[in-house]
Amino acid sequence: MKKIDSWLTKHGLKNRLTLVVIVIFIIFLILLFMFVNLSDEDTGQITITENAELRTGPNAAYPVIYKIEKGESFKKIDRKGKWIEVQNHAGTEKGWVAGWHTNLNIPADQSLSSNPLKGKTIVLDPGHGGSDQGASSSTPSKSLEKNYTLKTAKELKKLLNKEGAHVKMTRSNDKYVSLDDRNIKGDAFISIHNDALDSSNANGVTVYWFKDKQETLAQTLNSAIQKKALLTNRGSRQQNYQVLRQTDIPAVLLELGYISNPTDESMINDQLHRQVVEQAIVDGLKQYFSS
């Protein structure tokens, strides 16, 4: 006690009450500073700092619900990694936004600034081949599925190589390859097909997956193709195909139009349209590996 009195006297403080007041004042300043700098994350509200997308899940592989603009605010519901689940103030819409598009000071993923396909091994599986011609058209051109799956795969391979990806082909010419022999390892497996039905009315693109780990890739590619291709979008669907069942890597089977539909067939035959679809597949893969 004498030491405290001596310290108070030395610093011109006549009583302990003055010291208590100073301590309380310092604590008040600290609390005030903390309150002023309280982030909106703690208050349950976030603000969008740059134009972004509201998605159905916590990474860029999920489909976009709608575009959101800089300055909009949302109620924060949850957080997974660098992604924030939000709800609009009306309570009518929920979705996920990347945290680096908000005022929460979350750094962007480093992978977004580099080429996400560089060094990735992509397996391309042109359906059918050799004695297995696949589907065929009923038009005078008599288009064969096996020919166009191979053309698409070769053209897609060039685009992927430009992105720094290593591409493996289950076949690179018109030969028969068993389904068992198509089980090649990589970072992603893309089986390329054209659909067909007895009715010429069926049309469009379908993306198939089987295992749960394949669904995100399917949704991502379906969304990317939908943005660019002129073909009708039939969505992503679960189907027990052997090439999907037998692999342990992310895999999809793409039905890129109905060769039995004259309109779809003309687009399948058109190199420019194939290039649009192929670029959409590349975009989807880049988005998938950026997530």
Curated annotation (Swiss-Prot):
Any Gene Ontology biological process: cell wall organization
Localization (cell): Secreted
Ranges for region Disordered: 123-147
Gene Ontology molecular function terms on file: N-acetylmuramoyl-L-alanine amidase activity
Biased composition (Polar residues): 133-142
Keywords of this entry: Cell wall biogenesis/degradation, Hydrolase, Secreted, Signal
Transmembrane segments: none
Secretion signal span: 1-40
Keyword Methyltransferase: no
Family annotation (Pfam families): Amidase_3, SH3_3
GO cellular component, one term: extracellular region
Family: Belongs to the N-acetylmuramoyl-L-alanine amidase 3 family.
Function: Probably involved in cell-wall metabolism.
Name of the molecule in the record: Probable cell wall amidase LytH
Protein source organism: Staphylococcus epidermidis (strain ATCC 35984 / DSM 28319 / BCRC 17069 / CCUG 31568 / BM 3577 / RP62A)
Phylogenetic lineage: Bacteria, Bacillati, Bacillota, Bacilli, Bacillales
